[in-house]
Amino acid sequence: TKYHPSFEYSTPETVWEHYGLTKKRAESESGMNPKMFNSFLCGDKSSIEMCAVSNATDLKCPNSGLTYPPIGVYDIAKKLIPKSEGGLLDYSGQVEVISSIDLDKKDIPNDLRWGVYIVIKAQNEYVKNCFKDYGMVTDSSGSYSAIWRPYHYIGLELAQSIYSIVLDNKATGHTKNFNAEIASVAKKDLKAGQKLDGEGGYCARGRLISSKRSKQERILPMGY
């Protein structure tokens, strides 16, 4: 994804300047929804997606939410591993999203803005040797590697889920655990009783947090 801390306070009014588009070009000519595209930009959509992944797969939630490190594909296996093994993650088996730009808003080399990835770990020496023999990019220990795809097909993949439900009576994914929640974080001063406008809106942004913290602090979930 394309993430920068300054994007967290973007609204449907400011979203197009971050994409380098005019309002006319985006909305009138292309029919793009400013609230939806703002949710991609400010982190709401990434948090919601990783919440779903965490709760469906039992992958852990980072302690302080997603950090969006700017990492190219050839560094994924070197950096998206636990801190105890030289990486950036709080845990082994944790969700995270990477950014295609750095803090200066410059594109990083070999970015994965439009793609998806997964980090894998060898469970024995044979698999480690396979990583090496197959020319896979690994961390310094040779234990971690990454698999990525340069694109994800968004709504085009929906048909697969529909086929699975209709023909096999199976879901392609469903919630099995309650590891994570999306906290509503105010974008501006709010008044008591004010109605929030959900993801990509003007009032609040979403931050991925652990379900434990959500329950302890009685966090207000982000509305979709």
Regions found by a protein language model. Name each.
Residues 15-224:
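C-terminal catalytic/substrate-binding lobe primarily of soluble NAD(P)-dependent oxidoreductases
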Residues 1-13:
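A contiguous active-site-proximal alpha/beta segment in oxidoreductase catalytic domains
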